[in-house]
């Protein structure tokens, strides 16, 4: 197309940025072709590089100029945030609305600052290198510039939720520690995403290429008259029609032909079309409706977008489509990294009043009352509204507010310039999710519900919970929260004034067991014990503090025993505790060694000897010295003595001497030196032949060496080789005897005398070493020790055993006594509450050493007020066994508000709840939120209170009139929030759609078009009633807690979502087919179902990409979706030879069914099938292509069993076997035409081969083959 030179200006003096350069090259390319455009591009490149080099643009810290207005803007924003906080404190907005408003305030401030940065650079420093780089499009973008010199703004945490603390600093000023930590979330997220998602994106591209590689433009026109209406296209944008061909002619309003069918839609064509007042609907050709077999025709595909001309024959458009969809995935992966996880929440577009004036609009428009995310009331418009603003000078401005927008003003309302009057929802991929947020009480106090509609509900497990069905306030009437002792008796009623010593409650103290009273004076007289039982050793005295420890001397008939006490007096004892250890060196060794309890072979059992068997018998000790060393240098002097005999007192290591002498060995592996006392005997070769070489004991009088050496004592023989000679080491053995009879008895006196079997002191002997255990010690050990232990056979609840010293008549000596005490716990000892406690005292009704029977009242705990104040409330819902809760009003909880004319007080009365700003009379506003307690002549007394606004649907945890502490949960707000959409959601979403994955939490779909109503049955269960166009009524069950997406009486289309949730494409296809099959033939029903599903999938994929700012031409997505929706599954074979469950191409199945009908036979029945790209690749007509993708063994085995043929139509199969690919220069048009004709002609033969009725005999089949 030649350019119109009259319209082209000869010279333009404008600043050219990246976008202008792109437009310039596009126009050159469109008008002058590829050769001239490349020359222009080359010259532009040389020109720009020349001047860029000359200018030497570089970035320095000085170029990063922070706008002067930033400080002022941050200050104003903080004031606005504080105002929002005050609104929350008076209960005008909920905590969620406060959070959302705070986020929007900071987001708006960030955007204002961004605009200010632009204005500052443009007006003050247009040659700033940062400005030149970012806004020419050379390097960086506005988001990065904003973070450098504006503010970083709001960040989202790893869960995708926005943190309401913005980063107010920029990189030029530097971040604070807190800001840096918040900032690190996004940095880490970016790095992880880049690493993980690149692989996902690459794999997605591979699957897409595999599914679409055989789509090649094989013919110029398939001859179809079908297509898509312009309104059905996913982009739904007039300009996106460019590059397509008309499927039907366009007529003007007068009926004249404007453009015939198959006309290419160019920009000029669209501009001319816009000038027409009215014309017939536009229907365009599409790959979805192309009837070419295993390909797409030129006319249905349209332009090749790289050179804006009709696509060439032999073009591999499938691979182009796959790469066009897969490549942005890699780009998108990096997107998070570039912005560093910064949140930009432009979810709505605010409409501000262009001038001051009065609002007018027609009040008859359909709308519903709605509360915005910021807590403002407005109207949700159901239809477009024409808004008019008139000012006092008669100027009128009118503009349209579209449907689904929020209108925030009433008619006849006066508005100021720049006031927000409406919010328009942007068309972004908003992911709404239900969230919960707990409301915690900031102060302690009494709960009061104001205007709440409380309903008790039960969950699936039968647990009940309370919900609120109407917006209202939870008030916390302030006061100090206290817990009174358990089982206490409250003596006062709410509302009484309290003095300092007013008694609030008393708790009686009873004992469970009889005994003697002991009052512990050390615990301020509050500790009371009752001694129930005691046992005293009568044949033992304690010598206190002899050699820094107490000694216990026990006398028996034969001798005195000295024990060392191991337990301090007044200690609490447990079963088996050791009280004293006998001072006895009978069983003490001088060195380490090996202990054994029998003269059996050392390989016998090495279990620990039981205690009861140690009161009699013997054990045997084989002494041995062992010294550890850390380096060989320590034993270097002793190397010459290794494996020889050393004497007593000989130096082994520096400053280390042998105590016993003996056979010396250095063991380098264990880093130790051993000295084994004993005699060394050398064996002759003859003796070694007959000698028993096992280690063993030899008793006195027996031979060590047969017929040669007799031992005079018990020895232990060890056999070893040394310098190729054989030796025996006879080691001496010490024998320790444990007496058979008990030689120590304890005389014990019990009180009372009938209880002696429950508690006693026992003497036991213990060993601590296993049989044949080697003990390393240089100072010796006690092999057996005698202990006095505490034996408490029957523990009684509430009794505490204690060890005591009882004075005797002998000065400096005491008796050992163990007593059982019942400790009467007072409130101070028992309480584990973190709340500040009230003053408590214990009054005793008994004296020290008084005997009391069981269940005697021995005292009471008294709780007093402590300060002059007022008792506000007692929790009425607690039983007597729990801690009792009281609320006391302190002077700080009450505030005076002076009102000069109390008689004019008509607005409020005693008991009313008022918020900050409420009018008390005509002149005075309340400075506090609270309850009016009393009204005096000149002032009002207000009890401070905190209101919390809660919305409908909130789960309540507190109960009205109950008491709560600061930090207690009052309620859980249930609300919908918008999750920040990121490629972490975006790429898996695309993959989910392309793989046609099953969806969890499906939305309920309308089974037919009609009018939908929500109905409730007598059990309170909700259902959806759908009245179809033929007046057929269908009832659908609704799950509890599921929200509907329509208003009762709305018209809904077939397969549209009735409830919240994701739409499963499989469910949608089933719904569509089950509706259409009752109204059309199987072929038509299948075709219609596929078409609607294809449009849905294309729309969803495109929406996901566009939400990330990526634009892909619809024709690419159409090709992939066509491959996913090209198969059907046979349900019933009819009279053909197909089997139920077989998967066939839809077009092939339709042809076979047509032939069957023409022959007067029953065609097979089938249902449409949606396959994900992986399954579609595996179900490809080419088994070579499928086998090279996945599951090679299975695909090849099935193909071999079925005897399949591969017609080599795609690129992949040709590459694998080494043929020229049938695309580009390898594409033969005439050959393809012949092949297409042959394929169409073979349909009838295919039917006879594959679908002949089984009833006919083999002869018929042979006749057919001959024909």
Curated annotation (Swiss-Prot):
EC number: 2.7.7.6
Keywords of this entry: Chloroplast, DNA-directed RNA polymerase, Metal-binding, Nucleotidyltransferase, Plastid, Transcription, Transferase, Zinc
One GO cellular component term: DNA-directed RNA polymerase complex
Catalytic activity: RNA(n) + a ribonucleoside 5'-triphosphate = RNA(n+1) + diphosphate
Compartments it resides in: Plastid, Chloroplast
Keyword Signal: no
Residues involved in Zn(2+) binding: 222, 290, 297, 300
GO molecular function: DNA binding; DNA-directed RNA polymerase activity; zinc ion binding
GO process annotations (BP): DNA-templated transcription
Note on how the cofactor is bound: Binds 1 Zn(2+) ion per subunit.
Cofactor: Zn(2+)
SUPFAM superfamilies reported in the protein's UniProt record: beta and beta-prime subunits of DNA dependent RNA-polymerase
UniProt function note: DNA-dependent RNA polymerase catalyzes the transcription of DNA into RNA using the four ribonucleoside triphosphates as substrates.
Family from the record: Belongs to the RNA polymerase beta' chain family. RpoC2 subfamily.
Self-association state and partner proteins as the record states: In plastids the minimal PEP RNA polymerase catalytic core is composed of four subunits: alpha, beta, beta', and beta''. When a (nuclear-encoded) sigma factor is associated with the core the holoenzyme is formed, which can initiate transcription.
Protein name per UniProt: DNA-directed RNA polymerase subunit beta''
Organism whose genome encodes this protein: Emiliania huxleyi (Coccolithophore)
Gene transcribed to yield this protein: rpoC2
